[in-house]
Structures are given as structure tokens and as C-alpha cells.
């Protein structure tokens, strides 16, 4: 199987202000979209890897980029997805692109490879 990306239109860029974040359910996957103060936009898994608490409910410091999960206070760097406390975990990151002032997030799509010379 080969992996491809399907781009999903999430929302207009102007609806997610710099220094803000929002959670979304995209085709059954919880995502967290972050619009940093420097203008960059990132997307990560929206559930804490510890106990599947929604990260959008956590405490976010938009200046440092650190999000603290409301469940058990796990901390994540929302510039990189790296775990801070504990530091042995990481949030899955999704590709993001801006197209005509709209935020698009890439979800994985799988397509079956066709064997050019099938065995009979």
C-alpha cells in the first residue's frame, strides 16, 4: 500500500486568530489546530496520548507554545509536538497548508498498489 494525503478544508484562516487553538473531529480523528503568534499554523492529534483527554480543554500559553493537558497535567510543545513533561512522548503532527486563506489539514489516505506482474 502507498500512503497519500487527502487535504481536508477545516476553516477560514481568519476564524482562528493568531494565539488561538481549536479542536476538530475530522472523519473520526480528533485534531488540534494551532495558530501561533508568529503566524505559523500547526495541526496535532487532539487527544492526549496519556488518557485520551481532549487537548483543546487544556491550558495553553500562546507565547511559549506550551499546552498543559487538563487530565493529568502532561505538557506539550505545540511548535514541535514534543512532550515536555514527560519528555518521552510526542503528539502526532498532521501536515497543514493555507490555500486561498483557508486552513487545510492533510489526512492519510491509503491506496492499494497494483502488482504489475501478478502471480497466477
Where do the language-model regions lie?
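Short amphipathic
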Residues: 5-13
